């Protein structure tokens, strides 16, 4: 990702675009002396940022400085004919965006694969489900991974659609009429052929037909909002894992030699999950920046958006890249502590099954609201008893069994809270995994993708 967005790479991409346009112009009848294109090609990779900056200090124009630098190196002045600065920068930035999106697709597909693997591994690991962070019902650890995966699948599909439908601005000139190209090439048909050659060179499937100097900034909003959507599932799961780690239920991995705190030797913090949460907030900040550009275009275009885009676009991609790299590491190094999970589950289990007890009571002929009130009274009493007596046992089932108004025996209650079969979690996980398998088949490169080492 850093390579896609670094300054040297962008300059080389710009030079390649200049030469693609020049070659197309030559093919369409423009006089370009023999050897000129070859001379440009020879110096294509000679990027001296200091020299370009020195030129920019004088001309106060970044593209003009890069034109002068490339022409000086090649010894010719044949590039940029019939073009304006945005013909260069807009198309190259769109190429960078598409390349970055394609890399993100690979990383996200790899994350979906690992989510699927963890969902399968922990599909039968019953855990205390929580709403409002309070013990609620029994769920499985595998379902938590599957739920994150399904949210990420929707975001991933959106990114795929953005890539498939992303349009190139094309070579349109200062206000979008392509007048200079018509004059240069001698007709509209020739300009259309040039557009096709440029589109093919950049690897796009279609080009915008009627734009001004800049392409609509709502396209940038669509891209960055897609990245924010993609970050949501990792951030949600990371927060859940952080909460679970606070009860010693799971770990994101703790390597040999790692230190959790400079003050407290025992600490094993969920620093990577915390990083995921932080990077998701950073991404939302960049979305706010590009949102401010939507509906703010002056006439055919101006450069007030340039400052925002030069920061927000590359940095948004670097943020999602860091988030996904970290997420992949968490998924690879993740571990659970079954005995602690079981201990917590046993502590809460009767409470986690009050809805099942309620269903059993209504099936035995009791009115739902009457049963709800009776079970609630016993549950609150048993919970307070537990909190005030650390050594006490959970007496909820016995309290309900002893209540003559509730037509359920102790054995019937025990049967109602069994955790061997937890709803439809197994089918839900399998359904999500099937969709993920389709993603992996579309992106086979994700099978071998390895995240960078996270420091």
Language-model segments: which ranges?
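Generic, well-ordered alpha-helical scaffold segments in large soluble proteins
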Residues: 20-24, 69, 73, 114, ...
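Short beta-alpha connecting loops at secondary-structure transitions
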Residues: 2-7, 51-53, 259-278, 301-315, ...
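Charged, flexible cofactor/metal-binding loops and thiol motifs
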Residues: 93-106, 120, 134-297, 304-322
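A helix-coil-helix interface module used to build multimeric assemblies
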Residues: 1-178, 183, 189-197, 260-261, ...
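A structural signal for small-residue-enriched, beta-sheet-centric alpha/beta enzyme cores
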Residues: 85, 182, 186, 207-211, ...
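Short acidic (Asp/Glu) and glycine-rich catalytic loops that position anionic groups and cofactors
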Residues: 1, 19, 44-50, 254-259, ...
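Long, amphipathic alpha-helical stalk/connector segments used for oligomerization, subunit docking
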Residues: 282-368, 374-377
């Amino acid at each position: 990702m850093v390579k896609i967005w670094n300054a040297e790479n962008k300059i080389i991409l710009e030079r390649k675009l200049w030469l693609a346009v020049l070659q197309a112009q030559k093919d369409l009848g423009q006089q370009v002396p023999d050897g000129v294109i070859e001379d440009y090609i020879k110096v294509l990779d000679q990027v001296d940022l200091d020299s370009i900056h020195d030129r920019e200090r004088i001309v106060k124009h970044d593209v003009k400085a890069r034109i002068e630098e490339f022409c000086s190196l090649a010894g010719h002045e044949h590039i940029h004919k019939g073009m304006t600065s945005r013909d260069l920068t807009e198309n190259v930035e769109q190429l960078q965006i598409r390349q970055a999106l394609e890399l993100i697709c690979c990383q996200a597909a790899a994350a979906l694969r690992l989510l699927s693997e963890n969902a399968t591994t922990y599909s039968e690991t019953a855990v205390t489900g929580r709403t409002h962070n309070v013990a609620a019902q029994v769920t499985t650890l595998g379902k938590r991974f599957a739920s994150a995966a399904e949210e990420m699948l929707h975001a991933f599909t959106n990114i795929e659609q953005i890539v498939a439908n992303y349009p190139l601005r094309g070579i349109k000139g200062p206000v979008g009429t392509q007048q200079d190209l018509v004059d240069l090439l001698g007709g509209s048909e020739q300009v259309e052929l040039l557009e096709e050659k440029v589109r093919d060179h950049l690897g796009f499937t279609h080009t915008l037909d009627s734009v001004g100097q800049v392409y609509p900034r709502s396209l940038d909003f669509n891209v960055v909002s897609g990245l924010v959507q993609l970050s949501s599932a990792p951030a949600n799961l990371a927060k859940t894992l952080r909460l679970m780690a606070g009860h010693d239920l799971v770990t994101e991995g703790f390597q040999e030699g790692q230190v959790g705190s400079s003050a407290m030797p025992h600490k094993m913090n969920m620093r990577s999950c915390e990083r995921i949460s932080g990077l998701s907030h950073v991404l939302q900040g960049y979305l706010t920046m590009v949102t401010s550009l939507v509906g703010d275009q002056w006439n055919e275009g101006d450069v007030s958006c340039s400052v925002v885009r030069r920061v927000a676009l590359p940095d948004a991609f670097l943020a999602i890249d860091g988030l996904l790299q970290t997420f992949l590491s968490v998924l690879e190094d993740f571990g659970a502590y079954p005995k602690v999970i079981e201990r917590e589950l046993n502590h809460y289990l009767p409470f986690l099954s009050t809805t099942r007890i309620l269903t059993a009571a209504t099936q035995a002929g009791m009115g739902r609201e009457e049963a709800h009130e009776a079970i609630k009274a016993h549950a609150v009493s048993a919970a307070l008893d537990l909190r005030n007596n650390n050594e006490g046992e959970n007496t909820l089932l016995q309290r309900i069994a002893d209540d003559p108004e509730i037509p359920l025996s102790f054995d019937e209650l025990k049967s109602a809270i069994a955790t061997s079969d937890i709803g439809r979690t197994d089918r839900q996980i399998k359904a999500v995994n099937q969709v993920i398998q389709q993603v992996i088949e579309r992106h086979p490169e994700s099978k071998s993708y390895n995240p960078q080492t996270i420091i």
